[in-house]
Structure formats: C-alpha cells, structure tokens
C-alpha cells in the first residue's frame, strides 16, 4: 500500500492534506494563502503558510453622480410620476391628457366605453346661449390625413346643458370645461354668467373662432382687439378658470396670444381647426352643405406645433395643445414645444380609449427616463433664450 504523503507544519506534527471539493469552495480555498519556503530538520524544503493579516473593513466608496442617477432611475415607477397640471385659479388636473370639444359629446355618451375618471379633463361640446340646430348636411367628410367638419355648433343651449349634465359632472373626479361659443360679446358673457358657480362646471373654454355679427362677421379669433374684448368681458362676470382657444387662420399668432393673456385668460388652447373645403363627386359643387369646414386630424399637426411653439414663447400662462394627436410621440412633441397639456380630438372617433392609454404611456415614458414629473419634458425644444415656458397657472386672489 502506498503511504500517504504527510506535510510537516510549523509545530512539527504531521497532518493530512485537505481535499478540495469540486463545486464547493470558500474564498480561502479559491485563493490559497501564499507559502513561504523553509528547510525542515531533514534538510528538505517544505512550505509554511504566510503570516495572516487581520481582516479590515474596506472603506465605503463614494458613488459617482452617474451611478446615483442610474439608481434614481431604477427607483421611479410609473405610479410615482407627478402627472398633475395647474392651469390657474385652483384648476388642477390629475394629468395632462384631455379630450377636445366636439369629439366627446358631453362626456356621458362615453361613460360605458371609457374610464372617464382617468382623464385629465373633458372639454364638452360647444355650448351657446340659445339652442342651435346646426348646419345643413353633409356636415362631415374624410380627407387624406384628417377630416373636415361643419357641424355648426348644434346644441340645446346653455340652460338645457346645465339641467341635463351638470349634476352628473359634479360626481366625476375629472374636471369638465364647458366650451362656449357665441355671435356677440353679449352671448359669451351671458353664457359665462349662467355657468358661474354651477357645481360640476370646473372651467370655461372660449371658442372665439366664431363670426362676430356686430363686426360684419369678422371672427373674434383673428383680431387681437376683438379677442381681448371678449376675453375681458367674460373675465369680469366669472371667477371660473378661463381658457381661450386660438385660431390657426392668422398670419402671426403672437400679438393675439398676448392680447388674450393680458385681458385675463388663465390659459390658451391651440389650435382650433383650419378652414377648408372639399369637392363633391362629379365636381359640380363643394361637398359640405355649408361649403366651408374645419380641418382636423394628423394633417394639421405641423401647423399646431408651430402655433404652440410661438404662443408658448409669447405669453407667461400655460398653453394646452390640440391638433393631430394619435400616439404618444405626438404628445411628447407638443410638450417639447411648450405645451403643458394636450387635448385628443379627431382620433377619438376611431379609438375612444386612446386618451386613457396615453395617460399610462406618458407615465411609463417618464419613469423610464427617471423623471419624477412629466413637466420635465415641457419646453425641451424651445430656444434657450426663450426660458422655460409656464407650467403653472396664475394663483387666484379674489
């Protein structure tokens, strides 16, 4: 039988060599201690373990800013992102995704198919002082990249709207803004007066792209003085948050935006539809019964981006964007040029659930990039000299 090899230790006693087990090792076994040579009593070279140094705690290292940023990004979840929007006078929306006037009725029509309480806000169908039957048919037609509509503000009148819908609106978490239209300053003022103080009405959006009968049919929206006049008149009769909707059918939106802001508006919405026509089959006449219609949908997005870009730099009140939003990148584009919120319009006809889905996708996008608030995405495409656009409304002081 072959004799087992013995190792002479420093104490001179023979010991059996330790066996290493495959697949199971400690740190000491994985890295053997260095052996110092020594001559034994027989003159043969043996080895002894080097003197072990006492273990000391490794000092904590300072994390680099980049590492800290990565760790912060990992900690943010979509539910942690602040999505609230302050439009002034106490109007704080739960998130920046609203639905546009004329595409969502009065909200109740979509209650069975859309989680209404998850929307940032609802701009209801245009409301006038008296009932309107609307324009002659045809009223709507599809176009490449959008649609033309000429509904003509069909609605039952402000009193009927309040009676039929306000009680329901008052039970919703989502704020409802009543879109108001008129043919004279008096019309706008009287509708606003009747809406003031009504439970369920969170604010007013003025549609000033209407012909001013007292000024020969000139639209309020295309003249700075007329736009300021109607805005100031409404401001005097209500403390409700007041948004004013801009028309893209002008050469320069900036003086009009400034005039409206100076007249007391709390926020701007942009844009209303572009004016256009379609030709009927056979080409014997225009297709729409009223000849002219409003163009909306993806085709108007570049125009809307331009108007928002200019308005956001011209005023110090929030801008809410509208025009061609069909997916999250559209929302991000409008935020980048200075919008603090967006309204989804024409796309709702194809997919009523789109606005709620955009709320989730925007929160996920913010969390993915480590943003604690969606407002970190606002104004990133504006020139540096313009400064940061307004992301908060004016505080109301009665």
Annotate each language-model stretch with its function.
Residues 1-24, 35-42, 48-81, 295-316, ...:
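Alpha/beta catalytic cores of nucleotide-metabolism and tRNA/nucleoside-modifying enzymes
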Residues 105-106, 186, 350:
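Acidic-and-aromatic substrate-binding clefts and catalytic sites of carbohydrate-active enzymes
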Residues 110-112, 135, 192, 281-282, ...:
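Short amphipathic alpha-helical segments
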Residues 111, 159-162, 166, 189, ...:
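Predominant activation on well-ordered alpha-helical scaffold segments within soluble catalytic domains
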Residues 128-133, 211-213, 275-278, 349-351:
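Short gly/pro/ser/thr-enriched loop/turn and capping motifs at secondary-structure boundaries
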Residues 134-145, 279-293, 348-371:
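C-terminal helical cap(s) of enzyme catalytic domains, especially alpha/beta-barrels
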Residues 171, 183-320, 326-333, 337, ...:
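Alpha/beta enzyme core
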